[in-house]
Amino acid sequence: MTMGLVGQKVGMTRIFDEEGTASAVTVIEIQPNIISQIKTDETDGYHAVQVSVGHRKSSRTTKALAGHFAKANISAAALVKEFRVDSEEIAKYEVGKPVELAIFEQGQRVDVRARSIGKGYAGTIKRHNFRGQRKTHGNSVSHRVPGSIGQNQTPGRVFKGKKMSGHMGNKMCSVQNIEIARIDVERNLLLLKGSVPGAKGGYVVIRPSVKA
């Protein structure tokens, strides 16, 4: 359990190494991650560091959150995220102070979690990669239908989790073991190799990889 950061997805580009090999990277802007609360085992039952990112109008902030931010003496934030840390690491952090980008280094492997792009209502072929049925030989208007979804009188219901048509995307998903290609401390940019879930401007949670 180690500290992470919250950033915003800027988009994708490519960079070149010393040999001229191009690599596709995702650019993440790391806005100030201000510590809004420190949780300890004595008061909360576990050790964690809570960070606040972005800006929210006071008129758009609930009274509960407004009081929470006022207690930490920080401005209202758009997103609050919590990272569990070890008891030895908790002493390094202080409420009201930012978490620095220096906690990561180039070449390090990280796990990224974000909300995927919503695709709206989609059928089973697009949503779940179903094969589809025969195009000819007796098939009548059933080319893209999923087929049978039920059982017999027993159990007489459709099992939970059955792959069917519905809203595609707009779900929290994770990509593990992504390499940090480059870090720009001056501009607070993190360049990650490959793609990252979510749309441009979406919030991305980055933490050290659990499988590295």
Curated annotation (Swiss-Prot):
Function in brief: One of the primary rRNA binding proteins, it binds directly near the 3'-end of the 23S rRNA, where it nucleates assembly of the 50S subunit.
GO molecular function, one term: rRNA binding
PTM remark: Methylated by PrmB.
Cellular component aspect of the GO annotation: cytosolic large ribosomal subunit
Family: Belongs to the universal ribosomal protein uL3 family.
GO biological process: translation
Protein name (record): Large ribosomal subunit protein uL3
Originating species: Dichelobacter nodosus (strain VCS1703A)
InterPro entries hit by this protein: Ribosomal_uL3, Ribosomal_uL3_bac/org-type, Ribosomal_uL3_CS, Transl_B-barrel_sf
TM stretches of this protein: none
PANTHER family attached to this UniProt entry: 50S RIBOSOMAL PROTEIN L3, LARGE RIBOSOMAL SUBUNIT PROTEIN UL3C
Subunit annotation: Part of the 50S ribosomal subunit. Forms a cluster with proteins L14 and L19.
Region (Disordered): 134-154
